[in-house]
């Protein structure tokens, strides 16, 4: 089943329990390799990217058990340091295994990762930092070969706060001699979650925010850790509730991780209330909010740009989006136009003039968050829409269809 059929026009009403974050679970799974012990991750989302990460761990020799939202990994039996191209192609975050492989085995053979096509998204910062730590890395076409006689501590100053590079260097530093000082590190909550897990395993990681010090060579143990709630899943459902003029309450949510998104929604006329660990959004009239500029945390997240654009397509007034992190991140715009949205996009900017009503259309998702935007657009459109390419959505949203149906959406999968 890979097509969603959506009949729009029904406001979303209900309660949604958020899953563990995709962007936290994937680096956590890579981190289990570095421990050489048994680890348990609770509230791990049932998404295809997690399945792909578990397949990589099994290929490397780890024992992996998946039961509901619990993933147990025993990496004591890991015996390989190569990842075949067919596994690497399944997700962008597969490159996060490079650091722990070097830390654990001193060698790694892999290829450039897959995942969503969002422009260049180079891994140069990963490789540059690892080379500075003593790794010899060659890149032959799409093949990456890495070797080291022993990583060593040093100071790495990232030219920009790359999330992936920060995670990879933290994981590599677990096996280095001395201390890695990481400057201009990314500050996303998912990195804080990774550090909390590693500290529970015994890692010596000091500092917080953009300056981190990781002392390598410290013996690690296993740990049980609950994955951080998914703030991008939260942003998506909040945008859907706003677009359909609904009333939705999120549970298992961390509002403090959504500051920039909540500010935009409040500016757009949504009523937001927080109580007892829950976040409620009510919307009867949606106004344009902007300009919306994507930025590293704690700015407006690039992963929320597409879902919010779908909501602004049916808001009163004009909203300007400025995408500052990734090129090629307006690939959802043609599909929203097919629904009747008035959007002009050029280079880093998209100008959205809200319309009173969208109409059904046939669309194909080309990436995870763009696919979410298409679902939101279809939910508030008159008539029926069909969305193909839903495998992209299954990479990052667990139980999307039943969750929306429970809130009153007319959505089926075939």
Which role does the model predict for each range below?
Residues 1-414:
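Short, structured segments at the rim of ligand-binding sites
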């Amino acid at each position: 089943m890979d097509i969603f059929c959506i009949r729009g026009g029904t406001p979303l009403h209900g309660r949604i329990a958020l899953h563990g974050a995709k962007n936290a679970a994937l680096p956590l799974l890579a981190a289990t390799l570095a421990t050489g012990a048994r680890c348990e991750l609770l509230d791990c989302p049932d998404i295809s990217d997690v399945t792909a990460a578990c397949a990589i761990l099994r290929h490397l020799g780890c024992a992996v058990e998946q039961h509901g939202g619990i993933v147990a990994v025993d990496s004591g039996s890991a015996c390989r340091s190569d990842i075949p191209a067919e596994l690497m192609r399944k997700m962008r975050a597969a490159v996060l295994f490079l650091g722990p492989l070097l830390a654990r085995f001193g060698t790694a053979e892999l290829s450039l990762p897959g995942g969503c096509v969002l422009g260049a998204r180079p891994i140069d910062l990963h490789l540059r930092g690892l080379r500075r730590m003593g790794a010899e890395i060659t890149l032959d076409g799409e093949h990456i070969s890495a070797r080291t006689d022993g990583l060593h501590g040093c100071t790495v100053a990232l030219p920009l706060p790359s999330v992936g590079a920060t995670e990879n260097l933290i994981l590599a530093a677990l096996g280095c001699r001395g201390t890695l000082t990481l400057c201009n590190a990314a500050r996303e909550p998912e990195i804080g979650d990774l550090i909390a897990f590693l500290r529970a395993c015994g890692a010596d990681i000091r500092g917080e925010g953009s300056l981190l010090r990781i002392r390598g060579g410290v013996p690690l143990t296993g740990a049980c850790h609950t994955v951080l709630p998914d703030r991008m899943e939260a942003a998506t459902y909040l945008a859907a509730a706003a677009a359909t003029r609904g009333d939705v309450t999120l549970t298992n949510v961390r509002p403090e991780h959504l500051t920039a998104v909540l500010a935009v929604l409040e500016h757009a006329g949504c009523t937001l209330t927080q109580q007892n660990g829950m976040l409620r959004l009510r919307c009867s009239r949606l106004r344009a909010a902007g300009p919306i500029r994507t930025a590293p945390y704690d700015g407006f997240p690039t992963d929320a740009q597409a879902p919010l654009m779908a909501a602004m397509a049916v808001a009163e007034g004009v909203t300007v989006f400025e995408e500052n992190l990734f090129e090629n991140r307006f690939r959802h715009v043609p599909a929203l136009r097919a629904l009747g949205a008035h959007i002009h996009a050029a280079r880093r900017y998209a100008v959205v003039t809200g319309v009173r009503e969208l109409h059904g259309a046939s669309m194909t998702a080309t990436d995870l968050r763009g696919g979410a935007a298409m679902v939101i657009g279809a939910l508030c459109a008159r008539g029926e829409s069909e969305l193909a390419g839903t495998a992209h959505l299954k990479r990052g949203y667990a139980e999307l269809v039943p969750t929306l149906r429970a809130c009153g959406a007319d959505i089926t999968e075939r």
